Structure formats: C-alpha cells, structure tokens
C-alpha cells in the first residue's frame, strides 16, 4: 500500500431472497461510493441474496421451501448478474469485496468475491467452515481461501463472520502481510437476549482485535434485518423474539484498533467512509508484527496447507502396463 485510499463500508439490508433486486441495490451502493471518491467498497456476509436467518428459527423440514428458494436466488459467478457487478466496477473504477451465497453446480458456499477497478476478478474465496446450522446448507472452503491478494491499492484479504474467532486462520492471514482486511458480518439481530456470543459487543470486538493483532486496516460491513424480513420469516411471537429488526453495526478500524469512522444507528442504512493512510501500517508494525519480528517460531509455529482440495483429481494419461499400474499404485505389482 503506497498511497492513501478512501474506502466505503456497507451497512444496509439486501432485498431478501431476490437476486436481481439485490444486484440492483449493490450497483446503487457502488455508485454512491464512487461518487463520494471511494476506491474500494466492502459488502456484508451473504449480502446476495441475504443471510439465511430461517436456519436458526425452525426445524430443517420447515425450512425446505426457503432453502429451495435460497438456492435459486444465490449468485453464480459466471452469470448475467455477476457480469453486471463486474461491469459496474469497471465503469466506476472501483474495487469491490462482495459477500454472497455462491451457487456452484448443486452446492452453496459462503463466498467473498474481490473485483478490481477494471472489473477483473482478483480472487474468490469460501468460508472454511460454515457455522453451526449454516452447515445444513453450505459447503466448506479449503486452504486456497486463506490467502491475500497484492493489488495496486494494497494487500487485500477477507474473512467471514466467526472466521474471526479462529486463531490459526487469522494467523495464516497475518503472515501474508495483509494490509486491508474485510471482516464481513451478516447482522447482529439474532438471539439478542440469549447469548452475548452472537451480539455486537463480542463480534465488533473481534473485528477490532483483528486490526490490532494483524496491524492492518479492517472494514467490517454489516447487514441490517429489515421489517420485511421479519414479516417473511417470523410467523410466531417466539420467532419474533429470536430475530429482531436492525442489527447493523458496520465499522472501520485502523491498524492500532482505533475507530476511523463514526458508526451509524443499527437501523440506519448507509455507507461508512474513511481514508486509509499507509503510514499507520508502518507505525503499528514497528510495535508488534506477530508473524515477523514479534514472533517466536522456535517456540510456536503454524502448519498451513494453502492448496485447493478438489473432489476429483484427473490422473495423467498413461499406457496400460504393469509399470504404469505400479506407478499409480506402488502397493500392487502385476506379473506379465
């Protein structure tokens, strides 16, 4: 990161379970950010087509109609809707870090898509481990999803939600000299009276600690639960007590953990703005670089596999002979 960068951090409600309408809103927010002079905009977790709150409200059998609709409204990267977003990024000259539900063949993944100011894909990642009931609908990422990307605006990285409570995953990111991190959150509207672990105090603190631990800028976009979503999902008083409207707590933190933008009210839609000064990175790293001069690899080290792990690996074409079988299966020897 060589030059100051103005960034925008989204706090808004998607058009729930409506892919095309949420793409429209995505582009509108991108246009607002670009008009304000921002060079990068960050969106919440599963912004498209919205976070599947219904998974937390009832039994899997009750959710099946909504699960089917969620599949249909999730984003395919090679699609007209995705091209609309990348074309808008190119037209506006804007970097975009988009949280979305990725539909790949018959599976869904909690994804983040990084697009550069030319509309080209910088990187695509998937949440390594879906959280709790999310695992009834979403698949998993692999080590290739724990990486940073060197760009003209800085070294970019991203994680989703409770990935920020995974110390080893965070350390893998810190070790790659991450400079601008997007910590994407869905909203802090769930189980408010039952547990602090899902609330804004704990999870906003996780984003702030990430900034201080990694000495990087952290953009923490956060969605809002709209009254329309409550009307759609909560058909009883019990469900309305579990999921409440609001929950927006978007933040931007400096590499020393300081607030760089004034938060919005939890029901308020808008964009948070801040100008990131690269000099702040140097000052923070001088004090503590946990994967550099402040580390003790002779005492503790992280084992990290950054390679993709596809379900099917094509073997090379080999002539059918005893030698080729021995090459593929050294435990088998055939007599000819």
Swiss-Prot record:
Name recorded for this polypeptide: Nitrilase
Family under the similarity heading: Belongs to the carbon-nitrogen hydrolase superfamily. Nitrilase family.
Species of provenance: Pseudomonas syringae pv. syringae (strain B728a)
Biological process annotations from GO: detoxification of nitrogen compound
Molecular function GO terms recorded: indole-3-acetonitrile nitrilase activity; nitrile hydratase activity
PANTHER family the UniProt entry points to: CN HYDROLASE DOMAIN-CONTAINING PROTEIN, NITRILASE
Function: Arylacetonitrilase which is capable of hydrolyzing indole-3-acetonitrile (IAN) to the plant hormone indole-3-acetate (IAA), and allows the plant pathogenic bacterium to use IAN as a sole nitrogen source. Is also able to hydrolyze phenylpropionitrile (PPN), allowing the use of this compound as a sole nitrogen source. This enzyme may represent an additional mechanism for IAA biosynthesis or may be used to degrade and assimilate aldoximes and nitriles produced during host plant secondary metabolism.
Listed SUPFAM superfamilies: Carbon-nitrogen hydrolase
Record note on disruption phenotype: Cells lacking this gene are unable to grow in medium in which the sole nitrogen source is either indole-3-acetonitrile (IAN) or phenylpropionitrile (PPN). Their growth is also moderately reduced in medium with ammonia as the nitrogen source; one possible explanation for this phenotype is that the disruption of Psyr_0007 results in the accumulation of endogenous nitriles that can no longer be degraded and which inhibit bacterial growth.
Record-annotated CN hydrolase domain positions: 5-278
Entry annotated with the keyword Hydrolase: yes
Broadest EC class assigned to this enzyme: hydrolase
Record keywords: Hydrolase
């Amino acid at each position: 990161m060589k030059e100051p960068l103005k960034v925008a951090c989204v706090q808004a409600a998607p058009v729930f379970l409506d892919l095309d309408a949420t793409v429209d809103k995505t582009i509108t927010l991108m246009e607002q950010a670009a008009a304000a002079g921002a060079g990068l905009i960050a969106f919440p977790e599963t912004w498209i087509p919205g976070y599947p709150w219904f998974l937390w409200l009832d039994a899997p059998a009750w959710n099946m109609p909504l699960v089917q609709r969620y599949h249909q409204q999730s984003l395919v990267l090679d699609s007209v809707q995705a091209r609309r977003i990348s074309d808008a990024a190119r037209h506006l000259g804007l970097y975009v870090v988009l949280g979305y539900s990725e539909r790949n063949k018959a599976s869904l993944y909690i994804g983040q898509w990084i697009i550069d100011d030319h509309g080209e894909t910088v990187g695509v990642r998937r949440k390594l481990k879906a959280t709790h009931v999310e695992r009834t609908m979403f698949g998993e990422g692999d080590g290739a999803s724990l990486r940073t990307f060197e760009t003209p605006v800085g070294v970019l990285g991203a994680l989703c939600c409770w990935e920020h409570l995974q110390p080893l995953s965070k350390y893998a990111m810190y070790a790659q000299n991450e400079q601008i991190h997007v910590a994407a959150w869905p909203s802090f509207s769930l189980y408010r009276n039952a547990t602090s672990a899902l609330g804004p105090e704990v999870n906003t603190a996780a984003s702030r600690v990430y900034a201080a631990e990694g000495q990087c800028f952290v953009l923490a976009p956060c969605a809002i639960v709209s009254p329309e979503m409550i009307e759609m999902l909560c058909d009883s008083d019990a469900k309305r007590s579990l999921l409440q409207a609001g929950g927006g707590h978007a933040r931007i933190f400096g590499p020393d953990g300081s607030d760089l933008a004034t938060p919005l009210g939890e029901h308020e839609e808008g964009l948070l703005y801040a100008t990131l000064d690269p000099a702040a990175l140097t000052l923070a790293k001088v004090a503590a670089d946990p994967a550099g001069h402040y580390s003790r690899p002779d005492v503790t080290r992280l084992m990290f596999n950054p390679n993709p792990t596809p379900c099917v690996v094509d073997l090379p074409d080999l002539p059918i002979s005893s030698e080729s079988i021995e090459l593929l299966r050294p435990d088998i020897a055939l007599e000819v």
